């Protein structure tokens, strides 16, 4: 590295640090020289070393260097905070903050954005609330960069009212603040709120940019709001906003999430530039919409064109195999990942969940259970949840009970797992077990997630809950629904009441089923929809067996395509047949 006769200077060591910035072993050798020669006394070389270590992610060694420093400046504290946040080490970040306060070091305006991010990563609301008090105490609450991070923290904790209040209270909201708020709304599943604030942003004459467009197209994709999304995209083009490949990929994703696969394929073919995200988006979109063979064909084309797939691409491929019941193909693709020398293609928990879903949906429940037990990674709730869902579909009460016991122990507050187990018992007629599950939910304070459906009409999104009568056209909706139910009963429709409470009369069971949110959304769509145009319904949970059967009959009765996206996948109902082929 250095000739023994060469006299060392601070400048030479600085140049060496710059040349070795991405080489951990070299950096440690230079560190030893700095300490031995006494150049560490004024911290300047250690500062450069610390910055390099943070960039390469060696936070343990970075902390060692930091602790050697004599009264490090606030810039160095912030550098370490930044490194901890970037490397997902929130607890270490909070310990550093505690040390900072114990030593009486005063934070500056750049300190708190990192510490707030650390608390968001940690998911500790009480700690976040306390930190907010510190921010106010030190007088940084009005600064845009700090307030923006606090807003994002509250959104991630589900404290919508606090986040909105804080955002509205910001004296100056620049484009960065607006974009951050809109993005976190979408990331936390609050896309309707994102659209509402986008309209406020436009009303306040804040000029949006390509980052805004990406967030809003993503929001429209989540909501199934194709018309609104296209309006936003057209407006962006008219205002000469840079609709780069990131924007085009977001538009592509929106069409696929709205079930508009044919238009998405046209957009894909017309793209002047395509990257791995473009290809992966199409493959995942095809899989989600039940076009599994198209997804796998596109994957082959992608490889033939010399593009390297990433882990998202393989998620789409495995999902396609799962939705089509292609067990052998799925196993083959998963083996490709396992045997790959590319670390970026090592299977993640999401891929293992896809494999469990594939085996489970195909009725290979015991094989799926054994697969989980032999996994090299610790199975999370997503993986066990996939198996429990399969047990519910195939009505395997014994294995379902085993899996539910694991889930209730690890995630007692997630009501959907309790509900799935309850449905398994209900399907088997074990009503005493159903009562025990519901009693346990009450004891734990676990609540079932409220189901809702939405449908877009003339640039407005209409939401419906079960038995909802708050809609201005509620009377007409229920009249239309009654009319449809009478007609499809004559066609052979019989309400599936097996999972409805056992201690109510049959008439009440049928009434409860007939007022499910997706039925109300479909009835509204039939009233307002244009002839020849599909009805697009978005459901936040898995659609029930009865609503699935109802949708098939309605598509046949009215010759209207119904495109429904539930929690698991898309269902394209055409002429009495669903694209899922009863596999959901």
Swiss-Prot record:
Where are this protein's PPR repeats?
73-107, 108-142, 143-173, 174-208, 209-243, 244-274, 275-309, 310-344, 348-378
Q: What is the transit peptide's residue range?
A: 1-20
Q: Which PROSITE patterns match?
A: PPR
Which residue stretches belong to region Type E(+) motif?
Answer: 459-489
Q: Which GO terms describe its molecular function?
A: RNA binding; zinc ion binding
Report keywords, A-Z: Mitochondrion, Repeat, Transit peptide
Write out the ranges of the annotated region (Type E motif): 383-458
Show the Pfam families listed in the entry: DYW_deaminase, E_motif, Eplus_motif, PPR, PPR_2
Subcellular compartments: Mitochondrion
Positions of region (Type DYW motif): 490-584
Its family remark reads: Belongs to the PPR family. PCMP-H subfamily.
The protein's name in its UniProt record? Pentatricopeptide repeat-containing protein At2g01510, mitochondrial
